[in-house]
C-alpha cells in the first residue's frame, strides 16, 4: 500500500503502529469466538495471545504469544517536477497536498493458511493454527485472503483519516487515537529486552511516543528500533 498522509514528517513514526492496529482490527472478528485475542507488539508485529496461557506451549521470549502478521514501512521523499525544485518542509509542517507529502510504502504480511509445520519459527502462528480458517466453521483460506485484505484496507483508511484530523498527534483532541494504539499494544506493562542497533537494553515498557519508552534503573529512555522479547521474572 502506498500512502501520502497529510501529517508532519515528525509524526510519520506512528504509521507502522497504525498499520498494526488496522491489521489487528481486521483480524479480531475472525477469532472472536476462539480462545485467542489479537494485539500489536512494538514496533511492527501483530500477535495472538491465548486466553489460557497454560494451554499453549511457551516459547522463550514470547511465552504463549504467537506472531501472526507484520508491518514494514519505507519512506520516499517527494521529488521535484522536471526542471523544478522540490519544496523542503520543516519536520513540524503539514504538507499542503498529497503531491507535496512524503510517500510511505506500507507492506503487510499475514499468516493465513499455513499449517504449524509450515511456519518458520516456534513463535509464529497463523489464522489456520488458531482455528480461524480452514476448520469448517471459519472461511476457506483462499476466501480469507480477500476478506482480510478488504478489512485491512477499510480499517487503515479510517485510522489514517482520524490521524490526519488530529494533525498527526495521536494524543490531541482528547487522545482517543493514542489510547486505542496503547490499549492494543501488548508490549506495554511488560518487562522486556530490546536488541537495538547499538546494543541490548532491558526495562519496563511504559509508553510509546512512537518510540518505545523503557523504564530502567537509570531512568526512562526511548528506543526507536529493535527486536523485543519478554523477560521472564523469577520468583
Regions found by a protein language model. Give the residues of each.
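Structural signature of FAD isoalloxazine-binding scaffolds in flavoprotein oxidoreductases
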Residues: 1-2
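Long, positively charged amphipathic alpha-helical accessory segments at protein N-termini or as interdomain linkers
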Residues: 7-9, 13-37, 48-235
Amino acid at each position: 500500500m502506498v500512502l501520502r498522509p497529510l501529517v508532519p514528517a515528525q509524526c510519520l513514526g506512528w504509521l507502522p503502529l497504525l498499520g498494526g492496529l488496522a491489521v489487528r482490527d481486521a483480524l479480531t472478528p475472525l477469532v472472536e469466538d476462539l480462545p485467542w485475542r489479537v494485539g500489536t507488539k512494538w514496533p511492527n508485529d501483530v500477535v495472538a495471545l491465548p486466553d489460557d496461557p497454560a494451554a499453549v506451549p511457551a516459547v522463550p521470549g514470547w511465552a504463549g504469544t504467537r506472531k501472526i502478521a507484520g508491518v514494514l514501512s519505507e519512506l520516499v521523499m517527494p521529488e521535484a517536477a522536471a526542471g523544478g525544485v522540490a519544496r523542503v518542509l520543516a519536520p513540524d509542517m503539514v504538507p499542503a497536498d498529497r503531491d507535496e507529502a512524503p510517500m510511505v510504502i506500507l507492506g503487510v504480511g499475514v499468516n493465513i493458511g499455513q499449517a504449524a509445520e509450515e511456519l518458520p519459527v516456534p513463535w509464529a502462528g497463523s489464522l489456520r493454527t488458531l482455528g480461524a480458517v480452514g476448520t469448517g466453521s471459519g472461511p476457506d483460506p483462499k476466501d480469507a485472503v480477500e476478506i482480510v485484505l478488504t478489512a485491512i484496507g477499510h480499517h487503515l483508511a479510517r485510522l489514517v483519516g482520524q490521524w490526519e484530523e488530529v494533525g498527526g498527534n495521536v494524543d490531541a483532541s482528547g487522545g482517543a487515537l493514542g489510547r486505542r494504539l496503547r490499549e492494543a499494544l501488548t508490549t506495554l506493562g511488560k518487562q522486556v529486552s530490546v536488541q537495538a542497533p547499538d546494543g541490548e537494553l532491558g526495562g519496563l515498557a511504559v509508553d510509546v511516543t512512537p518510540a518505545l519508552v523503557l523504564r530502567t534503573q537509570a531512568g526512562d529512555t526511548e528506543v526507536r528500533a529493535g527486536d523485543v522479547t519478554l523477560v521472564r521474572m523469577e520468583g
